[in-house]
Amino acid sequence: ELRPGIYIIKDGPLKVDRGGSLLGENVGFYLTGDTSKLYFNTLSTVDLTAPKTGIMAGLLFFSNPKNATMTRTLGAKVLVRGHVIRSDDARRLVGTVYLPDDKLVIDGNSPVADKSEYTVIIAKAFQLNNGPNLVLQTDYDASDIPVPDGVGPMKESSVRLLH
């Protein structure tokens, strides 16, 4: 089990393979470098909550926006980096998953994040394969993990678009 804190993943994957587990309360992962990515394989266990305080309060995963995530092919931008969750036991992911220029693929047979008080996902592209069940809870008040500004519950003074 990880100790509370910030973990920097630089120039390589954060991989949890078959039979492996990644467990931690009050942990944040900062992904930096062109080859940093998440890969949670089948038969792995992932149970994480984001930090309560500090610079990454509420952020479970943060991908550095300066990472090279796209390449040009005949003038078009193509995503070259993707994060994959195939785990059959990634039931608790409390916090914000911030991958603004990356693709997130959920490709498992069991529910993902269904036991979380809340999960926010921010990604450039999002893909669900093989009938996975991604559950994005929004019970923000049930958690002491803060919700970063700009995501989560709307405040009365927030700007809203109405039809």
Regions found by a protein language model. Name each.
Residues E1-V135:
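Long, polar low-complexity repeats
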